[in-house]
Amino acid sequence: MIQLRQLSDVIVKDKVVLLRLDLNIPQEGGKITDNTRIVRTIPTIKYLILHGAKVVIISHLGNPKGRIELTLSLRSVVTELEALLNIKVQFCPESIGSTPKNAIIKMKAGEVLLLENLRFNSGEELNDATFVNELSSLGDIYVNDAFSCSHRKHASICGLPAKLPSAAGFLLLSELKHLTSIFSNANKPFTVIIGGAKMSTKLDLLNSLITKADYLIVAGAMANIFLAMKRFNIGASLYKPELVNVASLILKKATSTNCKIILPFDAVIQNFNSNNITIIELNSSLVMQSNAKIMDIGPKTIAQIINIIKISKTIVWNGPVGAFEQLPFDHGSTYLSKAIAEKTRTGSLCSVAGGGDTISAIKKSGVIDDFSYISTGGGAFLEWLQGKTLPGVEALMQKLDTAKYI
């Protein structure tokens, strides 16, 4: 297990603690649709409040690319934080400069201040030294409780630990503990389900898991790459042609490692002109219309995957298998969620899921509490699965010593 300085190792009373959270949560029309990532960080915030810290929360929302976009203001999460903490949460409309400095000077021990979206400043994603210096000047101690952002070499993830006494929050430690334990002791058959639309990084994941997994179930836009490789006509379905050759190499590698790659063999498609929805077989004779897209896996594919779930001892899931946000394209993710949950409840399956969309899909199915472990990480979860050291975790490891900060 990775050793990191914990909150109990740091004296925070009357100190300004810069607390990095991941408040990049799904919203529709300014309303939060899934507060999981906030809920999981509440114990860390409450600990800091109880121990007399001045808690300054920093985070990002969306990808404004260094520009101010009011629709991506973190002001939208203040009410949710207040409801979960049952205290007043102050908001600062800037993240660096005199405005947050003056707001922090007025803070009392046990109070909470949320700064504006860090990504409104380009220095955050660039890990710019000037931005790091300005941000670090606001606090006395840095705490990282954003596991889901710890794969990024950004200012608030890697820059701040180099400037301030640093520690890991409860959520970050919990993620590392659970994921390390699960993957170091994975019982077989070991099944991995990979879906979603982020294709490039997930192909790397597939390539690394071929030697570990017994079954690799590929769905969503990821599967479209393999279907295109087989020269299936998939209409306007999302995929990246430049990744087809990589998919071919992965299939060949899987053959030599006895890893079975499972692709959809039927699908739910939608014609975007007529809005007609049909179920089709995926084969070499398929001719999809140019304005039609694959939106979900079909019933035969669902049945096949459920059969694999029934014989699996460990399952890792990242990425929905269809466009679950839109009815009726949630069927695949819902059926798989319920099948995994049902077997997990018997005690014969260890089930792990990670990624914002995956969490939302499982939550929508009503069975999220039945999974063995739900990781808040998306990209961080994927990199951890590949055995990579996360930059944010490495930055904390470099600050490890036995001294307490007073």
UniProtKB/Swiss-Prot annotation:
This is Phosphoglycerate kinase. Monomer. Belongs to the phosphoglycerate kinase family. One of its GO terms (cellular component) is cytosol. GO terms for molecular function: ADP binding; ATP binding; phosphoglycerate kinase activity. The keyword Lyase does not apply. ATP binds at residues 202, 325, 355-358. It catalyses: (2R)-3-phosphoglycerate + ATP = (2R)-3-phospho-glyceroyl phosphate + ADP. GO terms for biological process: gluconeogenesis; glycolytic process. It comes from Orientia tsutsugamushi (strain Ikeda) (Rickettsia tsutsugamushi). Its EC number is 2.7.2.3. SUPFAM superfamilies: Phosphoglycerate kinase. It is found in: Cytoplasm. It is an enzyme of class 2 (transferase). The keyword Kinase applies.
